[in-house]
């Protein structure tokens, strides 16, 4: 798994004066502070970006929101965070561990973090200030005012892809642009709203973080799909008509769009390879072996 652990070393934590306890924040109040900190103005209700049921914003939820707002995905294993939405304490643990390592939570709760306690405005602003300057290992181009809150989803997808493939993409000077719909390319052309991701084969990638003024929850799939295009273009496509039974299985398992052309067939097959490898190997062995060969070829070029 790709480790999105920041390599920047925080110097010394600022001395924290003792403040009178102010009341805990609601989720909406906390998200307003985060948006204000980043200079974001939006009509969209951003409280739904986190998996939260409680009206009050806890310290652990605030830590996750702060770190996501800087486009940082701290977990060593993506499944550790996303496997069970019901186990919120487990979801937050990688964010808390990361924040404590980087000094972001120093002084919050008098150094007794107490993750389920409500977060105060002072604590939230202190954590936002301490996180300033920490960058994800792989930078995103922030074209959308909301992408700082949503880019963790894109990084979730990248974290599942082989390290060498992501490394190669960035070593070529490419960038992943977070944007909205419709996607507008550098030449000014506007894509159809059906496109939530786009790649210039000799250039960058664009991924929508919002669709119809609402968060786009499948950025991770779009990231995998576009990196699949990159792999297929750099190696060799597979003629989908040569493997009709395997193609039909992928249509049923994933979506009919994979039959659009051989480029889309490869990219969607790569999504299946990353997300459901055992199923792909069992039901589409030729496709599985082809992607394996392409990955080995790409790795050999590193």
Report the location of each language-model feature.
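A short alpha-helix/helix-coil micro-patch that ends at or immediately precedes a cysteine
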Residues: 34-38, 70, 157-169
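Soluble non-cytosolic domains of exported or imported proteins
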Residues: 24-28, 53-60, 86-90, 114-122, ...
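Active-site-flanking segments in enzyme catalytic domains
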Residues: 139-152, 159, 164-302
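Feature responds to low-complexity, polar/acidic, surface-exposed segments characteristic
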Residues: 18-94, 102-121, 130-141
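Repeat-associated, polar segments at repeat-unit boundaries in modular proteins
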Residues: 123-133, 290-295
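Sec-dependent N-terminal signal peptides of Gram-positive bacterial secreted proteins and lipoproteins
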Residues: 2-20
């Amino acid at each position: 798994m790709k480790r999105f652990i920041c390599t920047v070393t925080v110097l010394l934590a600022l001395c924290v004066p003792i403040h009178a306890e102010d009341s805990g924040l609601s989720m909406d109040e906390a998200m307003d502070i985060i948006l204000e900190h980043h200079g974001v103005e939006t009509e969209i209700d951003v409280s739904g970006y986190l998996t939260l049921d409680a009206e009050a914003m806890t310290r652990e939820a605030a830590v996750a929101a702060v770190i996501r707002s800087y486009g940082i995905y701290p977990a060593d294993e993506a499944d550790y965070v996303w496997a069970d939405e019901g186990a919120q304490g487990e979801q937050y643990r990688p964010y808390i561990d990361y924040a404590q390592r980087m000094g972001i939570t120093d002084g919050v709760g008098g150094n007794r973090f107490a993750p389920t306690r409500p977060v105060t405005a002072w604590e939230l602003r202190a954590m936002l200030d301490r996180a300033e300057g920490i960058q994800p290992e792989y930078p995103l181009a922030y074209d959308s005012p909301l992408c700082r809150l949503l880019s963790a989803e894109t990084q979730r997808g990248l974290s599942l892809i082989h390290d060498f493939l992501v490394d190669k993409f960035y070593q070529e000077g490419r960038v992943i642009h977070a944007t909205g719909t419709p996607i507008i390319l550098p030449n000014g052309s506007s894509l159809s709203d059906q496109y939530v991701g786009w790649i210039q084969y000799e250039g960058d990638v664009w991924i929508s973080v919002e669709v119809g003024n609402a968060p786009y929850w499948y950025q991770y799939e779009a990231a995998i799909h576009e990196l699949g295009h990159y792999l297929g273009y750099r190696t060799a496509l597979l003629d989908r008509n040569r493997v009709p039974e395997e193609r039909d299985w992928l249509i049923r398992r994933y979506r009919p769009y994979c039959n659009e052309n051989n480029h889309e067939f490869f990219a969607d097959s790569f999504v299946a390879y990353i997300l459901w490898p055992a199923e792909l190997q069992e039901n589409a062995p030729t496709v599985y072996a082809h992607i394996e060969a392409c990955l080995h070829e790409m790795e050999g070029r590193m």
